[in-house]
Amino acid sequence: MTAVRRVVQVVLDTNVVLSALVFAQGRLAPLRQAWQQGHCRPLVSTTTTAELMRALKYPKFKLSAEEQEELLADYLPYCATVRIPAKPPRTPPCRDPFDIPFLQLALVGKADHLVTGDTDLLSLAGTFACSIITAKQFLVLLAKD
């Protein structure tokens, strides 16, 4: 009998997703392949998706509306959408209020990992309900599976 492998549930912060999507040949290209191949399942909420959509419009990326749609189509279908309740769970104090939706998503979605490069979020590692790790650390974990 073959053991069923559980898909790793992961919250990816916006900058991690942007790096994987916009820089297709960059250092986070393996992360994009991981969600496309079903090695991990990104979790999203309406708030985190809205932030990603807003970030894709930043002038520095020089992406047309069509390119933005293509990048979203390369990510969102692989994600599980988590509904954050009207009374969201308490999160640890966080300096940046824009980080709170990612912490809430990790809690409500019962994520295995929150993947980020944000030093404010990384400073909560070891004190939060799920592991908070860098993209590099996450890729190492995926490679071990």
Regions found by a protein language model. Give the residues of each.
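Hydrophobic/aromatic ligand-binding patch that stacks against planar heteroaromatic rings
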Residues: 34, 105, 124
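PIN-domain endoribonuclease scaffold, especially VapC-family toxins
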Residues: 34-89
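Residues at secondary-structure transition points
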Residues: 26, 43, 66, 93, ...
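Short, well-structured N-terminal submotif of metal-dependent ribonuclease cores
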Residues: 1-44
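Short, active-site-adjacent cap segments at secondary-structure transitions
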Residues: 17-18, 50-51, 121-123
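Active-site neighborhoods of divalent-metal-dependent phosphate/nucleic-acid chemistry enzymes
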Residues: 78-113
